[in-house]
Amino acid sequence: MEQKHRSEFPEKELWDLTALYQDREDFLRAIEKAREDINQFSRDYKGNLHTFEDFEKAFAELEQIYIQMSHIGNYAFMPQTTDYSNDEFANIAQAGMEFETDASVALTFFDDALVVADEEVLDRLGELPHLTAAIRQAKIKKAHYLGADVEKALTNLGEVFYSPQDIYTKMRAGDFEMADFEAHGKTYKNSFVTYENFYQNHEDAEVREKSFRSFSEGLRKHQNTAAAAYLAQVKSEKLLADMKGYDSVFEYLLAEQEVDRVMFDRQIDLIMKDFAPVAQRYLKHVAKVNGLEKMTFADWKLDLDSALNPEVTIDDAYDLVMKSVEPLGQEYCQEVARYQEERWVDFAANSGKDSGGYAADPYRVHPYVLMSWTGRLSDVYTLIHEIGHSGQFIFSDNHQSYFNAHMSTYYVEAPSTFNELLLSDYLENQSNDPRQKRFALAHRLTDTYFHNFITHLLEAAFQRKVYTLIEEGETFGASKLNSIMKEVLTDFWGDAIEIDDDAALTWMRQAHYYMGLYSYTYSAGLVISTAGYLHLKNSETGAEDWLNLLKSGGSKTPLESAMIIGADISTDKPLRDTIQFLSDTVDQIIAYSAELGE
């Protein structure tokens, strides 16, 4: 499957960024305007921030600057992710990065003044509804503040600290070349995107196996570079943790999420211990239904019933999304309708494109979504997932100040995975045929929970071991990372999957390792979304409560936000309820198979 150039795709499959800026020149003018506003803000407030009134007035003006920075930062980032080979996009990204660094440095005086402000001033500011999140974060930073000169120096080094992720992202987009492979006498093209989105769950065993070996060999060629980039990332995080006086790099990385180490460890430990047997039971059933004597790592994404895995058009996908989110009501649905009408999504699976998917949030413009469309049902899950993220952006942006709009990383994946559950629910209820119902439940497992409760959770278990190494003063290279990943995979899958040296390269497949302790939050968010989904099914106020959670943005802590839908995440009950829900789902799938005589 050879990738086309971006120019070969129809306009309707490309996003329209003109809601942000008309063109590059318009973007550059916006940068100059923002620079002028920042300079004026500095002249007005540098050295003049002392009282509650000083800060209240400054926050009002700073919000307008941050909104400009939100628009500039998103526009700078997005075009390049559609084609890393495009020089103009690279220039836009560079201009945006330089501006962001300059702006951050110029505005450090405000953060410095805020964190050294009297507690009484911070307490009064924290009572203002539009500043609750900003003041909570300021108080966290206050406890680990290094002084104006050091903090400014660290801000100046922002681009340097970002370099490991930049290296990895560009390597994955431009350097990972997968060799052609042959299956049944036919030659197939392979790439990072086509393997991840198409071949890894192909119905043909030889195609799965050969594509996985081609894919793994392509990764292996770059394992030493990837390991070096990752080592630089975790060493810089450990350095910052030590400088700021945190007890560990874990405490440092969890601080901004407003959760503690106990919640982090519980998420990993309970899933590794209690969900692993559920996942193993399901995969052994998949192997049985598909007539496999053993299941290798090339097979674990195999659909339970590949004959029911239809090709889906983009129009079909939008129709499925609209029908799936109907339970949330008109207020939500009218926003979702705009995605197709106004081209908020970039679907083109062109060469040079970032292989992942994401949702961008230029504050109070409208969100954008990037993905690569291959026509599989899994793409519909990706689309509704990213619409979940960006739908939350719409509701929080419209109901919260800029300072309160952003959810804690801990549960930022809840809105996205909640939408996936709505899609599976819709698919399950479209037929009384046990095969169709089994198909829907299997996709609930594989497209939602396996990705978030397994793929990303195993990343988190891997990360925990890596950061522990660094905490103990050790280092690592590619061979050590391969060994750790192989150990984690084996611990989770037991005898359900054969784990080999190619599977050990899995750590090279995700950019999440460059985002702190982000990977585990997929499963944490899914616990909250599962609680929200069950609340929707069992309560008359379920839809309203969920929308209220979306509207709350970052105005509340993770524990407070989860309580909006009745989930107490200070305990292990929501996580155990989720695991039981999944165990029941596997039981129902096996029962449907028995009904079908399989």
Sequence positions of predicted segments:
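Conserved helix-loop functional segments at active or binding sites
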Residues: 323-334, 360, 389, 393-401, ...
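Short pre-active-site segment immediately N-terminal to the catalytic Zn-binding motif
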Residues: 309-314, 362-384
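C-terminal, non-catalytic "cap/extension" segments appended to globular domains
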Residues: 8-11, 22, 110, 114-115, ...
